[in-house]
């Protein structure tokens, strides 16, 4: 097992090395954090890009394995298949396709924690370092808005988009007062489904039903206006791109309420189970 830039907090070794039988090569800029199931045979510590280049130069392999090329082709084809999807509420794949189309390579996305985070990790391609910040490890709900304010203070010339579920947004939405006071015209895109989507997803996967995860949302447009920000509501799939364009022209913080179809969560779980856990 070759682990590149791997942190045991993000994907516990027990999930892929439960019996401790894999030999591990650890490639990272820092020494490995050792535990019972993560004990590398070899550690390559240093700049990851340089280390991989040196390994490549010394490798006898001349072509990429066919199975990985095929997997990449499948993922690209799946990603592109949502380009013209007009279903509503919007699928998370389509939302992120449009977001990636709109955001520049150097612009910054700050992800909150929830079901949307799983989709961002799967669907949002990054072209430059530190342009997609995700709270893993402790997985802190409510990070997106204050994180976006901080990013905008540091990089005022860049577009900064906070992406959050409705649950995570309401945990720290009062920081929109801070955003306004500090003159940071961030934009928050809310994946709105009136529930704690990731917990519901896990409950459905494990138990086939869910409980105690649904709630009522405020009117996010009026909520924004009450804080002297600007609010938008996506009413159809074709709305999202022009709303993003308009929101980033504003001089005040903005909130975009975008209904999401999280029936895609269970479909993804079933697809991954069938493909990789046979």
Task: List each language-model region with its residue ranges.
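Conserved thiamine diphosphate
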Residues: 43, 51, 57, 204-243
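Active-site diphosphate/adenylate-binding microenvironment
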Residues: 73-151, 157
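Glycine/aspartate-rich loop-and-adjacent alpha/beta segment that forms the canonical ThDP
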Residues: 12-17, 204-207, 237-278
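A short alpha/beta connector and helix-capping loop motif
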Residues: 39-52, 175-192, 270-271
């Amino acid at each position: 097992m070759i682990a590149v830039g791997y942190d045991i907090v993000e994907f516990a070794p027990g999930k892929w090395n439960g019996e401790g039988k894999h030999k591990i090569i650890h490639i990272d800029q820092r020494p490995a954090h050792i535990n019972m199931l993560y004990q590398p045979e070899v550690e390559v510590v240093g700049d990851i890009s340089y280390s991989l280049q040196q390994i490549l130069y010394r490798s006898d392999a001349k072509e990429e394995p066919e199975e990985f090329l095929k997997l990449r082709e499948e993922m690209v084809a799946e990603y592109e298949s949502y380009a013209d999807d007009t279903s509503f509420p919007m699928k998370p794949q389509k939302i992120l396709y449009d977001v990636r189309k709109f955001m520049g390579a150097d612009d910054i996305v700050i992800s909150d924690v929830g079901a949307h985070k799983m989709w961002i990790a799967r669907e949002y391609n990054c072209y430059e370092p530190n342009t997609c910040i995700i709270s893993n490890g402790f997985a802190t709900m409510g990070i997106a808005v204050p994180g976006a304010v901080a990013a905008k203070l540091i990089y005022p010339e860049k577009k900064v988009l906070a992406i959050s579920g409705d649950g995570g947004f309401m945990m720290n939405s009062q920081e929109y007062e801070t955003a306004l006071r500090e003159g940071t015209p961030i934009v928050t895109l809310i994946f709105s489904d009136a529930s704690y989507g990731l917990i519901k997803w896990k409950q459905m996967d494990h138990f086939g039903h869910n409980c105690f995860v649904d709630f009522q949302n405020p009117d996010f447009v009026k909520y924004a206006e009450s804080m002297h920000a600007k609010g938008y509501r996506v009413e159809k799939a074709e709305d999202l791109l022009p709303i993003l364009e308009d929101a980033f022209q504003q001089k005040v913080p903005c909130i975009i309420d975008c209904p999401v179809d999280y029936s895609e969560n269970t479909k993804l779980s079933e697809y991954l189970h069938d493909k990789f856990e046979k």
